[in-house]
Amino acid sequence: MPEELSKKQTTRLNKLQKRLRREVGSAIADYNMIEDGDRVMCCLSGGKDSYAMLDILLNLQQRAPVQFEIIAVNLDQKQPGFPEDVLPAYLDSLNVPYHILEKDTYSIVKEKIPEGKTTCSLCSRLRRGTLYGFAQRIGATKIALGHHRDDIIETLFLNMFFGGKMKAMPPKLLSDDGANVVIRPLAYCREKDLEEYAELKKFPIIPCNLCGSQENLKRQAVKDMLNQWNRQFPGRIETIFTAMQNTAPSQGVDREQFDFVSLKRDPDAPMKGDVAEANLPAFDFLDIANSGHIDLDAAKRIDIVNVYEV
């Protein structure tokens, strides 16, 4: 039997639960992740994030203004040492409908990936394909994954540094074939909060390194960089995520996102200065007649004292 929490731990758990519930609720509302009548397939890996996601979604299910189903699904990829009884026992205790799928992707990965190389990428693709197909079989209208805010930010920098793309993990995604909608209810949640929540809730965590593969070194390098920034500049990670939600294509350089080629000056636009010059008289700098000069009152005149050439 798990040890009972102290009064201090119980208080902390309640605060964390409220925060995570609020953040998940906000993400669901902001991106219209869950709608009335949805059948949500909640993908469980046995890690802290997916446990927390299921726990919070079950909690919100009792309070949400819409009705939706939750079906938990785990894919047993036949990794050596995988404890097959852990998830069924946990899900039975919650009285949650669930499916355990069995597919030996481990052997496929070991056959295709050279010894010593990271297998996570191929393993993830094989897992995703199986889960997408099963979602259609059971009539799931949404597939919920346990990626959190840190995952999203890390993916942005991974793609920037190593892929040359401004691309992250969207909170809501339509699969390429249009058959599945993927949602990430933990998109606003911090990893450290989820770690603490999982520890206090005493989820039966299954390690993700049973296959023997080391975590992607590039992702770990990005994670270390972000952690260092967070220590050195508190609040920077929050600012990065806010920036990701406030993009301005017209202020970038991506011609696919904004039509720079067709930009033309409007010759009929009213003659006025820039916003920074709102109090100055308006004139046309391109008008040859005034040669770019205008007479100002002495009080408004700026004298140039010295000009230095570099």
Curated annotation (Swiss-Prot):
<dbReference type="GO" id="GO:0034227">
    <property type="term" value="P:tRNA thio-modification"/>
</dbReference>
<keyword id="KW-0547">Nucleotide-binding</keyword>
<feature type="binding site">
    <location>
        <position position="211"/>
    </location>
    <ligand>
        <name>[4Fe-4S] cluster</name>
    </ligand>
</feature>
<feature type="binding site">
    <location>
        <position position="123"/>
    </location>
    <ligand>
        <name>[4Fe-4S] cluster</name>
    </ligand>
</feature>
<comment type="pathway">
    <text>tRNA modification.</text>
</comment>
<keyword id="KW-0460">Magnesium</keyword>
<protein>
    <recommendedName>
        <fullName>tRNA-cytidine(32) 2-sulfurtransferase</fullName>
        <ecNumber>2.8.1.-</ecNumber>
    </recommendedName>
</protein>
<dbReference type="InterPro" id="IPR012089">
    <property type="entry name" value="tRNA_Cyd_32_2_STrfase"/>
</dbReference>
<dbReference type="GO" id="GO:0005829">
    <property type="term" value="C:cytosol"/>
</dbReference>
<feature type="short sequence motif" description="PP-loop motif">
    <location>
        <begin position="45"/>
        <end position="50"/>
    </location>
</feature>
<dbReference type="GO" id="GO:0016783">
    <property type="term" value="F:sulfurtransferase activity"/>
</dbReference>
<dbReference type="Pfam" id="PF01171">
    <property type="entry name" value="ATP_bind_3"/>
</dbReference>
<keyword id="KW-0004">4Fe-4S</keyword>
<keyword id="KW-0820">tRNA-binding</keyword>
<keyword id="KW-0819">tRNA processing</keyword>
<dbReference type="GO" id="GO:0051539">
    <property type="term" value="F:4 iron, 4 sulfur cluster binding"/>
</dbReference>
<keyword id="KW-0408">Iron</keyword>
<comment type="function">
    <text>Catalyzes the ATP-dependent 2-thiolation of cytidine in position 32 of tRNA, to form 2-thiocytidine (s(2)C32). The sulfur atoms are provided by the cysteine/cysteine desulfurase (IscS) system.</text>
</comment>
<keyword id="KW-0479">Metal-binding</keyword>
<dbReference type="InterPro" id="IPR014729">
    <property type="entry name" value="Rossmann-like_a/b/a_fold"/>
</dbReference>
<keyword id="KW-0808">Transferase</keyword>
<keyword id="KW-0694">RNA-binding</keyword>
<dbReference type="InterPro" id="IPR011063">
    <property type="entry name" value="TilS/TtcA_N"/>
</dbReference>
<keyword id="KW-0067">ATP-binding</keyword>
<comment type="subunit">
    <text>Homodimer.</text>
</comment>
<feature type="binding site">
    <location>
        <position position="120"/>
    </location>
    <ligand>
        <name>[4Fe-4S] cluster</name>
    </ligand>
</feature>
<keyword id="KW-0411">Iron-sulfur</keyword>
<dbReference type="GO" id="GO:0000049">
    <property type="term" value="F:tRNA binding"/>
</dbReference>
<keyword id="KW-0963">Cytoplasm</keyword>
<dbReference type="GO" id="GO:0000287">
    <property type="term" value="F:magnesium ion binding"/>
</dbReference>
<dbReference type="InterPro" id="IPR035107">
    <property type="entry name" value="tRNA_thiolation_TtcA_Ctu1"/>
</dbReference>
<dbReference type="GO" id="GO:0005524">
    <property type="term" value="F:ATP binding"/>
</dbReference>
<comment type="similarity">
    <text>Belongs to the TtcA family.</text>
</comment>
